[in-house]
């Protein structure tokens, strides 16, 4: 391993450690029961699969929790794809387990800022999810 690669590894470890320290208060204050971490999910109904970061109770409500990093603060309007992804995980979780996780929580570690936390209800994002899946299949079918 050359010096630049080793230095990069050290930087990444420090960055991960700093992110965890930044997120710790949010996690400690809001998350109670954890149902799963890095949960592999799939849906025959949707025809998609993925791996969910965390399924836990957030402020007492079973929730799909996705962790993101960003160099700058993002507005809710700019992260609709994150909510659609969370809606997919929520549907997959319910299909696989029979348990509902109606909320989608995006916890974003932002460089040099406090973490951003967005909480949305799954049902607000299912239409976008279905449209995204349909668009993906259409593009794939026509080779775009």
Listing of model-derived features with the role each one plays in the protein:
Residues 12-44:
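A short acidic/basic microdomain associated with nuclease active sites
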Residues 4, 25, 144:
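Glycine- and charge-rich intrinsically disordered segments
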Residues 3, 33, 46-48:
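Residue-level preference for beta-strand/loop junctions
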Residues 6, 33, 100-101:
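Short loop/turn motifs at secondary-structure junctions
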């Amino acid at each position: 391993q050359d010096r630049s690669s080793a230095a990069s590894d050290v930087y990444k470890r420090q960055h991960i450690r700093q992110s965890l320290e930044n997120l710790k208060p949010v996690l400690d204050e809001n998350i109670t029961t954890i149902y799963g971490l890095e949960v592999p999910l799939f849906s025959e109904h949707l025809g998609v699969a993925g791996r969910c970061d965390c399924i836990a109770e957030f402020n007492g409500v079973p929730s799909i929790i996705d962790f993101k990093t960003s160099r700058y603060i993002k507005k809710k309007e700019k992260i609709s794809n994150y909510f659609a992804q969370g809606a997919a995980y929520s549907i997959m979780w319910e299909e696989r387990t029979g348990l509902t996780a109606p909320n989608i929580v995006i916890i974003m570690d932002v460089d040099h800022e406090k973490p951003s936390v967005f909480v949305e209800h799954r049902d607000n994002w299912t239409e976008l999810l279905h449209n995204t899946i349909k668009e993906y299949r259409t593009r794939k079918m026509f080779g775009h």
